[in-house]
Amino acid sequence: MSILVKNDFGQVQQVKLSSDLSALIIEHKNTQAKVSLYGGQVLSWQPVDEKEVFWLSKNSAFEQGKAIRGGIPLCWPWFGVHPNDNENKEGNHGFARGQEWQVDNIDVNEQGVEVSLSWQGNNMSDLWPFACKLTQVLFFGKSFNQVLTMTNLSENDAYYAGALHSYLSVSAPENATITELAKASFDDKLTGKAYAPKPLATPLANGIAPVDRVYHSNEVMTVVDSRWQRTIQLETINTKQWVFWNPGVELANNMADIHESGEQEFICLEAANTQMQLLRAGKSLTMAQKITVTSFKPKSAQNA
């Protein structure tokens, strides 16, 4: 354990997640958080007087070469199966979440903690044979901000897809309502069909699993948790879709990195560009999100 920054407002320490992996532990008067340097992956964020916002599986494998289940994995430079990988030999969601990121800067101030991370690579895959650099600026305070900047360092244009794959902690999926989703058309990955905007069958229909949908919207989304009496608002910049996912009991039981009944503790709402987007040679693009939590019950009861 080593203290990287410490002042009157808070501190940031670097600790071991396992023999293989390291993480940053953030402590501040407004918030607590944890970030894995493997994958540049946010693992937790808990504003003061609130419950944990992000879900992390107790069975997550903190090992090189294995994805961490929970927090905000980075899906990049493709989402799901690469369109040119018919046999899925390269796996889902690209290679960014399996790389070791470096800490470029940490700023601990009165409002919160800002962490800047980066990773750079070249010819990481036959499906993506380009030089590239990724940077993240993460702000943890009473709200959370994430800005991912993608730079094409090669001499050729490239195409990317990606998502900020947020696992949101909820009292139960059936208690999570996202009414804005009813206004958007979507592709249902379970049925293989596309649907026009579809009114909710019941007020709590959104979170009932299994669900795997790509909603064609970049509107602000608000997750209302009726039991925990809080809202989680997500705003996004430079994305075209929201991906809504929960595996449900049957699939989760066959996923070793989801602890028993873990699927009953989260929903995924992912700011995404699921289709390939142009990233010109020598140019940069960004994807970003802001998450805000608001309770609508007395503070004395918020951690009950």
What are these regions, as identified by a protein language model?
Residues M1-R69, E219-T239, K283-S300:
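Beta-strand-rich N-terminal accessory domains
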Residues I3, Q13-Q14, E90-F140:
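Extended, loop-rich substrate-binding clefts of extracytoplasmic carbohydrate-active enzymes
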Residues K66-G94, A182-G192, M221:
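Beta-strand/loop-rich accessory regions of lumenal/periplasmic or secreted enzymes
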Residues G98-Q99, I106, L204-Q277, A281:
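Acidic/His-leaning functional-site neighborhoods
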Residues L134, F144-Q146, L285:
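Hydrophobic core residues within well-ordered beta-strands of beta-rich domains
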Residues T149-S154, V293:
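Asparagine-centered strand-capping/turn motif at beta-strand->loop junctions
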Residues D157-Y159, Y167-Q241:
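Active-site/ligand-binding surface loops and adjacent short beta/alpha elements
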